[in-house]
Design a protein with these regions (language model features):
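Pyridoxal 5′-phosphate
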Residues: 1-406
């Protein structure tokens, strides 16, 4: 019954053609796009062009002739409308961690007399580690409050509210507008980590009056492992924001080679070192794909896939603890489940060709990337998961020892 319905839904799916634009290995159903997106077929050709022609043939001239120097701003401008920002407010550069450090530092410098960076326990570790690093330098004070009590914790000592919009384990999303408004009412600035939202669900940074944001390029934007991240600074802060990593590419005139640093006047001030051209070129391919389809269409299908997955599990009487919100409007493009042997179960699924994501200590995440997942895939995943749980094949010792990367 569910397979027949899946075939009907796949035939009617307006996004079905986009699956053919990805390199997908035979015998694998991939539900880990929330951790590393799949490879677009256009990416190898783009990289070969950059390597063979722009680098191999044109050499250093390509900084001008191929527009290498403009890639961070160009890719950032393409990401901007996908996260509810204007083109001049976003730039693609560095990693999410480095961009967090830049923007937390900038926000603290804009808030004299306040040092507290407020976040929640269980936020993605790098977000919390960046606060710790600044705290050790005497520049910040870390305060963690459970998500249900964040608004009441916003007092006049809070310089910055820093939250991840979609939680990396549970997929639960924050009400960006409500929390941003509450922070501003308390005199605080807000920094949103969009790593599990960008390219997956509608975000309206400018509409919510967000101050700062960061996000990564290798998940839903399919930019490849270690792809450059992106950073957002609201237009109203572009002049005042000053980041501490004053590398030469963030200079107002980098090729004047001045002894003294003068920050670029716009979003380019967030640049630090020489841009990673290969990574940016690959990221641009993934971003162009998302832009071609549109976030609203992607989100609609990802939510439909998630609900269909829940129905398939119910049909098979799979008893497993859902930790994602049941309300689709309150979660991103993933469903997460808790099981004490989550790691071993994930390994048993991988052995059967179903790749999901494990999050320590006991969470399994299944990313619903709508560009390349079919409803028929979901039926098969539910079948395999049910069989793995019923047979307890995950108890095999070969599935018990964690790899270095889990």
């Amino acid at each position: 019954m569910m397979l027949e319905r899946a075939r009907f839904l796949d035939a009617a799916d307006p996004l079905r053609e986009f699956r053919e634009r990805f390199m997908l290995p035979d015998g694998v159903i991939y539900l880990d796009g929330n951790s590393l997106g799949c490879l677009p077929k256009a990416t190898p050709a783009r990289l070969e062009k950059v390597v063979r022609e722009e680098w191999g043939r044109d050499l250093i001239r390509s900084w001008n002739t191929a527009g290498w120097i403009d890639l961070p701003a160009r890719v950032g401008a393409k990401i901007a409308p996908l996260i509810g920002a204007r083109p001049h407010e976003v730039i693609a550069c560095d990693s999410t961690s480095v961009n967090l450090f830049k923007l937390i530092s900038a926000a603290l410098a804009m808030q004299p007399g306040r040092k507290v960076v407020l976040s929640e326990p269980g936020n993605f570790p790098t977000d919390l580690y960046m606060i710790d690093g600044l705290e050790r330098q005497g520049l910040a004070e870390r305060r963690l409050t459970e998500r249900g009590r964040l608004i009441e914790a916003l007092d006049d000592s809070v310089a910055l509210l820093m939250l991840t919009h979609t939680h990396y384990k549970t997929g639960e999303t924050f009400d960006m507008a409500e929390l941003t408004r509450a922070a501003h009412d308390a005199g605080a600035l807000v920094l949103w980590d969009l790593s599990h939202s960008g390219g997956a669900l509608p975000v309206d940074l400018d509409g919510c009056a967000a101050d700062f944001a960061v996000g990564c390029g290798y998940k839903y934007f399919n930019g490849g492992p270690g792809a450059p991240a992106y950073a957002f600074v609201a237009e109203k802060h572009l002049e005042a924001a000053r980041q501490p990593l004053t590398g030469w590419m963030g200079h107002a005139a980098p090729f004047a080679f001045s002894d003294d640093y003068e920050a670029a006047p716009g979003i380019e001030k967030l640049l630090c070192g020489t841009p990673p051209i290969l990574g940016l070129a690959a990221l641009e391919v993934g971003v162009d794909l998302i832009a071609e389809i549109g976030i609203d269409r992607l989100y609609a299908k990802s939510q439909a896939l998630s609900e269909f997955f829940r129905q398939c599990l119910s049909e098979r009487n799979v008893a497993i603890d859902l930790v994602s919100p049941t309300d689709p409007a309150r979660r991103g493009s993933q469903l997460s489940f808790r099981h004490q042997d989550a790691y071993a179960i994930c390994q048993a699924l991988i052995a059967r060709g179903v790749i999901g994501d494990f999050r320590a200590p006991n969470v399994m995440c299944f990313g619903m990337a709508p560009l390349y997942l079919r409803y028929a895939d979901i039926v098969w995943v539910a079948k395999v998961l049910a069989e793995v749980l019923d047979s307890e094949e995950w108890r095999d010792p070969c599935f018990q020892t964690p790899a270095e990367v889990t």
